[in-house]
Design a protein with these regions (language model features):
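Feature for long, exposed domains in two main contexts
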Residues: 1-13
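Von Willebrand factor type D
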Residues: 11-191
Length: 191
């Protein structure tokens, strides 16, 4: 056995303008700040809320069912399953549906529908949904159900499925009324 000494040279500094990864599956996470990279996203907001006057497309509002409100933490937490118009591969598994939660997350498949927690649990773990995609995961509420909601829409000609949380607030924080609106777009991987 021989010991061969060596030193690492500088490889540069990681900055907010650099992507994260790759992980064990080869995924790399780019965001809009990674402008120096060829693969950085250029986000094109597509408004699908029927509550918005300038909606680009009419989204379908999810009619969430709220369980027995026996627990204070569970007052506005719900998850519903929506069928995808294409098969979506996520970490090596194909899915034909997603579970959409009022608390700003989706999970691949129908198994996540049993979970509606606003808590940040380990992925995977007994307290959270598996195959999770945290879009803006926190305890969220609708300030006025007639003026807010969660919508989805499929743009067939562009092969993208959009989920939008429209006009939500931080849960239980009346002083933090934010009217949060955010969305995630899933692209058909076969196109």
């Amino acid at each position: 056995n021989a010991v061969i000494p060596f030193e690492f040279g500088p490889v540069g500094e990681v900055s907010a303008g650099d992507p994260l990864g790759p992980d064990d599956f080869g995924y790399i996470c780019f965001d809009s700040r990674d402008e120096e990279w060829v693969d950085h996203p250029v986000y094109d907001w597509v408004e699908i809320s029927s509550d918005e006057r300038d909606a680009d497309f009419p989204g379908t509002k999810i009619d969430f069912e709220f369980p027995d409100r026996q627990e204070a933490w569970d007052s506005w937490n719900s998850t519903e399953v929506v069928e995808l118009p294409f098969t979506f591969r996520y970490y090596g598994t194909d899915y034909d549906s997603i579970s959409i939660c009022t608390n700003g997350w989706i999970s691949m498949g129908a198994e996540g529908a049993e979970n509606r927690s606003p808590e940040d649990w380990a992925i995977p773990g007994p307290g959270g949904a598996d195959a999770l995609l945290n879009v803006y995961h926190t305890d969220l509420e609708t300030s006025d159900p007639s003026l807010s909601g969660v919508y989805y829409h499929y743009l067939e000609d562009e092969s993208k499925f959009i989920v939008e949380w429209y006009n939500h607030d931080f849960g239980g924080q009346t002083q933090l009324r934010q009217n949060l609106t955010f969305q995630v777009i899933l692209y058909n991987p076969s196109v």
